[in-house]
């Protein structure tokens, strides 16, 4: 049997080490997409506009309610949801200030005084703006998928809030949010499908 010379053995070891490194890097790339990478990707987009269609299943009424309208956000902390159908409503949040409008009437309050709304707003706003600190403070967060197609599962850390909103799942492609699913503790659930407006997507 032909014996490897010391030089050849050295080359073989270096080649094996490089191959092992490539395999490890590939495995890390495939399995390592996490919240830090996702929020970094999302934070590059500083503003956006989209249309939405939402279907909400209300168990008490045994029916599904549909609505549609427009969404907008501006980093670092502004989120606007304007419902156009079946009736005009507007929800605008900047920082901790929530303004709700219905027709010509409007009401302004602190976001944290409306816990159910706060959980949903913070889940969507925090994801849109790539605010990892806010998401980690308020939720147990789990990312699945890849940078090209991902899902972010959020469960409120506060047990009292979890008694109202069981979980939120935000899904998207690249740096664009495309769907938000909300499961309330009473069994009601909603799915909001989001379509970026031309020129608004990254």
Q: What is each model feature region?
A:
Residues 21-32:
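Hydrophobic h-region of N-terminal signal peptides that target proteins for export
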Residues 37, 43-95:
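N-terminal mature ectodomain segment of secretory-pathway/periplasmic proteins
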Residues 42, 119-134:
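Short, solvent-exposed helix-to-loop capping segments enriched in aromatics
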Residues 109, 132-202:
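Gly/Pro-enriched, hydrophobic low-complexity segments
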């Amino acid at each position: 049997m032909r014996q490897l010379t010391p030089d050849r053995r050295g080359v073989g070891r270096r080649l094996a080490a490089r191959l092992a490194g490539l395999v490890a890097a590939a495995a890390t790339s495939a399995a390592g997409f996490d919240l830090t990478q996702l929020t970094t990707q999302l934070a590059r987009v500083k503003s956006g506009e989209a249309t939405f269609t939402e279907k909400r299943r209300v168990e008490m009424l045994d029916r599904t309610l549909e609505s549609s309208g427009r969404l907008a956000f501006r980093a670092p902390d502004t989120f606007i949801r304007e419902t156009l159908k079946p009736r005009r409503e507007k929800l605008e949040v900047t920082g901790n200030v929530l303004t709700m409008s219905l027709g010509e009437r409007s009401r302004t309050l602190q976001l944290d005084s409306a816990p159910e709304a706060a959980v949903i707003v913070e889940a969507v706003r925090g994801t849109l703006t790539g605010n990892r600190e806010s998401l980690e403070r308020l939720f147990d967060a789990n990312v699945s998928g890849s940078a090209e197609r991902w899902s972010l599962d959020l469960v409120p850390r506060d047990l009292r809030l979890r008694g109202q909103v069981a979980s939120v799942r935000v899904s998207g492609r690249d740096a664009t949010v495309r769907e938000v699913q909300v499961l309330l503790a009473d069994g009601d659930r909603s799915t909001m499908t989001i379509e970026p407006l031309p020129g608004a997507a990254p």
